Amino acid sequence: MHDISSLTTRTKTLPPLRVGVGGPVGSGKTTLLEMVCKAMYPQFDLIAITNDIYTKEDQRLLTLSGALPPERILGVETGGCPHTAIREDASINLIAIDQMLEQFPDADIVFVESGGDNLAATFSPELSDLTLYIIDVASGEKIPRKGGPGITKSDLFIINKTDLAPYVGADLAVMEADTRRMRGDKPFVMCNLKTGDGLDQVIAFLKTEGLFRG
């Protein structure tokens, strides 16, 4: 059960931070959202919107995991190409955000998880203030050097499932070097979300670059 006592005494003065979470199918977007929500709620007032093409599977998974109370998670069925719903025509997600903020007007963060997509996926600026883009090691050592907006333009780039490197022949040092070359000074995290390794860096980023940035 979630303790909401810390939420009842707060006075909200700023609009919520909108955080887009993108990445290919199976990279760990839903796991990332689950772990971040469990670590930050109820200290922070959170809501989450998940995108799936034909189902509300990610909403179901987040709810079953206890990431947030069920009423704070809303699933959106986008249909068609998932990146359209976060970029070219984000109206379905903007409506979902408005709907959730009517219920939770004091929200600190609104997470929007995109449907699984390719390396070219980006969030519309009206939908997301910060973007997290996640890939997994099992998809291949070469992924960071392929580039694409998700890798080069996201505010935080996350390389997940580092524990699988020995089993898929991936060299983490090469992936790290390629990431530095493609992103320059932009931050990235090597992590294993199943064990929580690297999660603290993601949360610190959300706080320093989002919630507490002057």
UniProtKB/Swiss-Prot annotation:
Gene3D superfamilies on file: P-loop containing nucleotide triphosphate hydrolases
UniProt xrefs under CDD domains: UreG
Highest taxon of the lineage: Bacteria
Signal peptide as annotated in the record: none
GO molecular function, one term: GTPase activity
GO-annotated cellular components: cytoplasm
Binding residues annotated for GTP, in chain numbering: 23-30
HAMAP family per UniProt: UreG (MF_01389)
Known partners and oligomeric status: Homodimer. UreD, UreF and UreG form a complex that acts as a GTP-hydrolysis-dependent molecular chaperone, activating the urease apoprotein by helping to assemble the nickel containing metallocenter of UreC. The UreE protein probably delivers the nickel.
Family according to the record: Belongs to the SIMIBI class G3E GTPase family. UreG subfamily.
Protein name, as recorded: Urease accessory protein UreG
Gene source species: Bordetella bronchiseptica (strain ATCC BAA-588 / NCTC 13252 / RB50)
Gene: ureG
